A protein has these predicted regions:
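Proline-enriched interdomain boundary motifs that mark the N-terminal boundary
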Residues: 20-25, 107-110
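Short beta-strand elements
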Residues: 93-108, 199-214
Length: 214
């Protein structure tokens, strides 16, 4: 009887100790890849911060201060990530948490301050030096870069020329086409390939940028 009482008491105390764990993502309750800094707070009663080990199923977690960590993920191989928290003193698993991993928003292509299908004055159009990508409504400091794009230049007489450009800034061939802009000409930027943060995957925008020179 005493033995059963001891086991029951130990189980209750052990479960109570395990319950003294607070883990929270500071911004939103999901993780984002591409190197976004997913900041998190971890507090475990009776376990010094220096004895905590945080093991992510993928990505990397860095301690930035007492109880505060940053979880960074590059590629998104799955939409679920698991965090295991251990006590370094006895290698005991204190808690296991599961989080959803969301894709970052699709960036929006811009030419200067203009979006797709806006008419562009000739002089203003020629002063632009390249395309840019903007992440809207995304509360993380993350940059997306253009890998390459194709430009189709269609004159008012319907003559057409296509050039490929590596990177965001105009190369010499594309710059030459930009300099030819006249009223009624059309410039279509398409097959825009991009990469965000540390995510190695090259993706393509579904939207094109099409401008008519006025």
């Amino acid at each position: 009887m005493k033995s059963m009482y001891f086991v029951l008491l130990f189980t209750i105390v052990h479960l109570a100790a395990r319950a003294q764990v607070a883990v929270s993502l500071d911004k939103v309750n999901v993780l984002y890849p591409a190197g976004a800094e997913n900041t998190m707070t971890v507090v475990v009663t009776d376990v010094p911060d220096s004895n905590l080990v945080l093991e992510p199923s993928f990505g990397e977690i860095k301690r930035v201060s007492q109880g505060h960590y940053v979880w960074q993920i590059c590629g998104r191989d799955t939409n679920v990530a698991t965090l295991i928290i251990k006590d370094l003193r006895n290698n005991e698993v204190i808690a296991t948490k599961t989080y959803r991993v969301n894709m970052i928003p699709i960036p929006e292509p811009m030419l200067g301050s203009k979006k797709r299908h806006d008419p562009r004055p000739n002089g203003e159009f020629k002063t632009q030096g390249g395309l840019a990508l903007v992440l809207n409504k995304f509360d993380f400091d993350l940059k997306c870069d253009i890998v390459y794009f194709d430009l189709q230049y269609i004159t008012k007489n319907m003559d057409s020329v296509v050039k490929r450009n590596s990177g965001a800034r105009w190369n010499s061939e594309v710059q030459e086409l930009i300099n030819k802009a006249k009223t009624g000409d059309i410039y279509a930027f398409y097959h825009i390939a991009y990469r965000c943060g540390c995510d190695p995957m090259v993706r393509f925008l579904s939207d094109d940028l099409i401008f008519t020179i006025k």
